[in-house]
A protein has these predicted regions:
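Bacterial N-terminal signal peptides
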Residues: 5-16
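Chalcogenol-based redox active-site neighborhoods
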Residues: 20-184
Length: 184
C-alpha cells in the first residue's frame, strides 16, 4: 500500500501536466462560435465578429470557481477597461456548462467581460488547450493558456502557465503594443 502511495505521488502528478503545445504566433486562429455569458446573461460569441472590432484576448482556464481560475478572473476584471482602451475584446473559456458560466460571469468576472462554455471541448481541442490526462477528480479540463489574436485571424501571442500570475500582464502588454502600431 505504501508503494502505491509513493507511486501515485511521483507519477500521479504527470496526469495533469500541460501539453505545452499551444498554437504559436503566426498560426491561424480557429474560428468558432460558442455560448457565452456576461453579467449573467447568455449570448452567442463569434470570434470572427469580435475580430472585426480589433484583437481578441482568448484565455482558457481549467474550471470556474476554483482558486486559480477565480484569481485570474478577478485580475482580468480589474484590467478589463485597459483591454477595451487598447481596442481588444476579452473572453475566457472553460469546459464548464453555460449554467455555471452565467454565475461565474457575475460573481468572479464582475460583469466586466464574458466567459464562454465549451462542454464538448471542441474549441479547447482546436486551440491545443486540452490538458493531457485528467485531474485528480477524474475530469478532463483545459490548460491555462492565453492567446492574443490579431484582427486578421492569426495568433499574435500565446502564453502557457498553470499559474494565473502573468497572463493578464503579458496579454495586456501585447494588446497595447498592437494598438500603438495600428493607430490611425
Amino acid at each position: 500500500m505504501k508503494r502505491l502511495a509513493v507511486w501515485f505521488a511521483v507519477f500521479g502528478g504527470l496526469l495533469t501536466t500541460p501539453v505545452w503545445a499551444a498554437l504559436k504566433p503566426g498560426d491561424a486562429a480557429p474560428d468558432f462560435t460558442a455560448q457565452a455569458a456576461v453579467g449573467g446573461k447568455d449570448f452567442t460569441f463569434s470570434l470572427s465578429d469580435a475580430l472585426k472590432r480589433g484583437p481578441v484576448v482568448l484565455y482558457f482556464y481549467p474550471k470556474s470557481f476554483t482558486r486559480g481560475c477565480t484569481i485570474e478572473a478577478h485580475e482580468f476584471a480589474e484590467a478589463a477597461a485597459s483591454f477595451a482602451e487598447a481596442g481588444a475584446t476579452l473572453i475566457g473559456m472553460s469546459k464548464d456548462p453555460i449554467e455555471v458560466q452565467r454565475d461565474f460571469s457575475t460573481q468572479e468576472c464582475r460583469d466586466k467581460f464574458p466567459v464562454a462554455a465549451d462542454p464538448s471541448l471542441s474549441v479547447i481541442h482546436a486551440y491545443d488547450a486540452l490538458r493531457v490526462g485528467v485531474t485528480a477528480s477524474g475530469e478532463t479540463v483545459s490548460d491555462r493558456i492565453s492567446y492574443v489574436i490579431a484582427p486578421e485571424g492569426t495568433v499574435l501571442y500565446s502564453y502557457v502557465d498553470p499559474k494565473p500570475d502573468k497572463h493578464i500582464e503579458n496579454t495586456l502588454a501585447v494588446v497595447r503594443q498592437w494598438h500603438e502600431q495600428h493607430k490611425n
